[in-house]
Amino acid sequence: VNPQIPPGPPGRFFLGNLPEFARDILGYLTFCAREYGDVSHFRLGRYDAYLLNHPDLADEVLRTQRENFIKHRFFWRHVTAIFGTGLLTSEGDFWLRQRRLAAPAFHPDRIAAYGGTMVAYTDRLLDGWGDGETRNVHEDMMRVTMEIVSKTLFDADVESDVEELGRAFEMVLREIPVRVHRPIKIPDWIPTPGNLRYRRGVRRLEELVYRILAERRADPRDRGDLLSMLMAARDDDGNAMSDRQLRDELVTLFLAGHETTAIALSWTWYLLSHHPLVKDRLVKELFDQLGRRPATVADLPRLPFADAVVKEAIRLYPPAYVLGRQALSDCEIGGWAIPAGATVYLSPWVMHRDSRWF
């Protein structure tokens, strides 16, 4: 183990490299990987941080030594008002319990059953598109994924609420990166415009979720959606999820499920608009395999080029472009000593653009 600090950019006396990191996180991490190799060191204020830019090192953090690396508290404590203790934020035994409870809801057969819903809502979106029309496809993708997630998650058609929900999501999603990356953390109780927007967005989302939970408690029959599975799930002691636990999981799935998918689809549209030959080949495959009939889940194995297009878009523009983990105790990664309390960053954005792998 090399006891020295890995190479990295020099920083300011007090702030370290925080200004550059906060101003352009992807540009900064790309610079560190290019200039300093697979393991680089920088400081965020008084905290040590490391960028690991190799798939084997990511495997060390996320699998081999996963018990020594927790989800970054510095990040998650600023978003617990919205995510609570759902799968995205929880740790240890509680995370494992929640994961086991939720796992049956995500069985491939269960997910495949939602294919018809996805096609129906997509057709409804396309009915509103006109030839030659200019569209904000990101807004369209956010809307249709919100509708699909609402229907498949808790059998709710939110068309009447979608504009208000859209505003609530925008309030929350716009504020999350601001809360995480700003150098000076402002307490939630201070009524800044950002804090007020965030609280309004969280309150509106909670009102919707708790209203749905109350309706489902009053009529607990299985509706074939994910919420039915979550409500029916029992742990080894026979305990079900509480309303608060269900709320946390539903908000996590609602936010993460619709926003990340919408981002991936938006970048796919963007890339297709810049690569007409790829677009033409994709259209040909779709017409050859489907003609003009609606797609089904059974068609997916016969659409390899469509699969490749989406995966390439996600490679180039991964919705989860950086992950942070905190070391619980001193350890060794890639031959370098990582001290307890240090943060390690893994960036799919940077790794996916490394010519050694792609």
Model regions and ranges:
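Surface-exposed helix-capping loop/turn segments at secondary-structure junctions
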Residues: 128-135, 156-160, 214-224, 279-280, ...
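Short, hydrophobic/aliphatic alpha-helical segments
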Residues: 2-3, 237-254
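Cytochrome P450 C-terminal heme-thiolate binding region
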Residues: 38, 45-58, 84, 203-218, ...
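Active-site catalytic microenvironments for nucleophilic, acid-base chemistry
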Residues: 151-156, 215, 268-275
